[in-house]
């Protein structure tokens, strides 16, 4: 799925790694975008587990076991509240899925989405948008959460 990204992952991965910010990446495939559903790929599942947000391995299949978690779309000039649904459908082997309410208004198929967290919310960044790159300046990123403050921010 990440191989379909319209934006190279290496540069943005380095940005977050240099700041010690845990990040996961998702790329909505054309089919997933149409259905507003994405596979919760292994690195995303690990990200959720490592941050104490969700453990898909312990989740049972079906709508009764869906978990909803607060989330936000990060825009260059504001943050828009949304939610993430983490679930395993009854079909097939219950492959883990994620659904972000309103995703279609925030991205296009094959856009690179970066997910960061302050452990209270998931923050979704459309890294395929040039305006989001500008908004990732450290002093702006720290407005999402103090966790994202780094030495560059403190120096300003």
Residue ranges and their predicted role:
Residues 1-156:
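Intrinsically disordered, charged low-complexity linkers and terminal tails
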